[in-house]
């Protein structure tokens, strides 16, 4: 069954990416612009600090320690190794996708945009934050106990939402990040279970 999810996720990401390219950019998709405004224009002052914190620190400051902790213990090392594989693939494919797609961020088109952090200078699509946190969360979903992946999913959703909330990403950037990240998670689980990676695991357990 996982093989079907694998191909569906990749296909959806590719279809969305091609569509965005064909129409000349995310700014030309009406619901994408309106959903951005709905989220960004309805900021709640008491939540701004939390959203900025999640946007700035919800990626590296959560997933690096989580991965390191899982690698330390033999019982969870397999999960940690799968996360490492996932993140390496996500970083590479994420950067390649950004430069292939070359999509500008919403503050270049939507006026006003209520920015809560400095303007990023790189491209927008897909969201690197959404890509990494979704990769981590879905990898946990596929490999770890229920309590662990539930926490991962909650954290990933909040971080992804925060990127639109603070004004630095289109909603479709986040959706694309989740599609690509989820596909990478399925791929990484397959990679971990076969070939040289399995031999490395066995050596570490010895």
UniProtKB/Swiss-Prot annotation:
PANTHER family: AT30094P, SPHINGOSINE-1-PHOSPHATE PHOSPHOHYDROLASE
Swiss-Prot/TrEMBL keywords: Cell membrane, Hydrolase, Membrane, Transmembrane, Transmembrane helix
Family annotation (Gene3D superfamilies): Phosphatidic acid phosphatase type 2/haloperoxidase
Entry's Gene Ontology cellular component terms: plasma membrane
Subcellular location: Cell membrane
Organism annotation: Sulfolobus acidocaldarius (strain ATCC 33909 / DSM 639 / JCM 8929 / NBRC 15157 / NCIMB 11770)
SUPFAM superfamilies associated with the record: Acid phosphatase/Vanadium-dependent haloperoxidase (SSF48317)
Protein name as annotated: Undecaprenyl-diphosphatase
Catalytic activity: di-trans,octa-cis-undecaprenyl diphosphate + H2O = di-trans,octa-cis-undecaprenyl phosphate + phosphate + H(+)
Transmembrane segment boundaries: 5-25, 53-73, 79-99, 138-158, 164-184
Major place of residence: membrane
Higher taxonomy: Archaea, Thermoproteota, Thermoprotei, Sulfolobales, Sulfolobaceae
Matches recorded under InterPro entries: P_Acid_Pase_2/haloperoxi_sf, P_Acid_Pase_2/haloperoxidase
EC number: 3.6.1.27
Membrane association type: Multi-pass membrane protein
EC primary class: hydrolase
Keyword Repeat: no
Tree of life domain: Archaea
Protein induction: By polar lipids.
GO terms of molecular function: sphingosine-1-phosphate phosphatase activity; undecaprenyl-diphosphatase activity
Residue pairs linked by disulfide bridges in the UniProt entry: none
């Amino acid at each position: 069954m996982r093989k079907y999810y694998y191909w569906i996720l990749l296909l959806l990401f590719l279809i969305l990416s091609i569509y965005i390219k064909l129409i000349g950019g995310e700014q030309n998709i009406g619901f994408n612009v309106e959903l951005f405004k709905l989220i960004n224009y309805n900021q709640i002052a008491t939540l701004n600090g939390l959203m900025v914190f999640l946007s700035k620190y919800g990626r590296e400051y959560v997933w690096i320690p989580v991965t390191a902790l899982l690698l330390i213990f033999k019982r969870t090392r397999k999960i940690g190794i799968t996360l490492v594989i996932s993140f390496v693939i996500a970083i590479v494919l994420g950067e390649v996708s950004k430069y292939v797609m070359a999509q500008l961020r919403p503050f270049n088109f939507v006026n006003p945009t209520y920015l809560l952090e400095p303007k990023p200078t790189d491209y927008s699509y897909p969201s690197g934050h959404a890509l990494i946190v979704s990769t981590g969360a879905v990898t946990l979903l596929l490999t770890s106990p229920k309590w662990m992946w539930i926490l991962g999913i909650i954290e990933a959703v909040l971080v992804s939402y925060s990127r639109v909330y603070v004004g630095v990403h289109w909603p479709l950037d986040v959706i694309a990040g989740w599609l690509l990240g989820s596909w990478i998670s399925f791929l990484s689980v397959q990679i971990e279970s076969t070939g040289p990676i399995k031999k490395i695991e066995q050596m570490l357990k010895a």
